[in-house]
Design a protein with these regions (language model features):
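Middle-to-C-terminal accessory/interaction subdomains
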Residues: 1-39, 43-205
Length: 205
């Protein structure tokens, strides 16, 4: 069990720990069950070579049920409300260190409150525009995975409607999940320093 900021300082010397906490927060937001092996760490001999930086890579398997009904997930009933399907070795620090847990909750608030920006919404709109612009019948018929899910697709119009509806569905799902997390008393308490309350942590994890 770590006290104070020592744990953060040690980890941050090895890895961009704030970036990792934000990646973990995003994975919790979209209920990803495959975030551990979808993370790319990189370093450079030219700059800051002893410290790894992060780059998200193919964050798939979102809005899925945790493996084995969450039996392998780290944390207790309280922390699992805002730490979804956490199974990474480094994640164990969060449920042993109150300082690290507070830092995680603050980054979760950052991602939830500032991450879904107008700019990201504009990206969704642009994706819709590109789908409509680039899709043709030949391309639509080549979308084998999509047509397997919905065999009735046999034209560009059919494929465009299905893809755009999917975009809108996940956009709505993400917003609903965001509001659920923001209503959590521990997440909300971490947003305002004056309202902070301790999160029950696991002594052995």
């Amino acid at each position: 069990s770590s006290r104070g900021s020592a744990c953060f300082e040690q980890l941050n010397g090895l890895i961009d720990i704030v970036g990792y906490l934000r990646w973990l927060a995003l994975s919790t937001w979209v209920e990803s069950v495959d975030y551990v092996d979808e993370l790319w760490l990189f370093a450079s001999n030219e700059a800051d070579r002893q410290r790894f930086l992060l780059h998200a890579w193919d964050p798939d398997d979102s809005f899925e049920t945790c493996h084995r009904q969450g039996r392998d997930a780290i944390g207790n009933a309280t922390t699992k409300q805002f730490l979804y399907c956490a199974e990474g070795t480094i994640d164990r620090v969060l449920v042993r260190s109150s300082d690290m847990m507070m830092r995680y909750l603050k980054e979760l608030n950052y991602v939830l409150r500032e991450g879904l920006t107008d700019g990201l919404h504009a990206i969704v709109i642009e994706q819709e525009r590109q789908i409509k612009h680039l899709m043709n019948d030949e391309t639509a018929l080549g979308l084998t995975e999509l047509r397997k899910l919905k065999p009735s697709i046999n034209s560009a119009d059919d494929a465009s409607v299905e893809m755009i509806n999917s975009l809108r569905y996940y956009e709505t799902l993400a917003e609903e999940r965001r509001m659920t997390l923001l209503r959590n008393p521990y997440v909300y308490a971490a947003w305002g320093d004056d309202e902070w309350s301790s999160v029950p942590l696991d002594e052995n994890c």
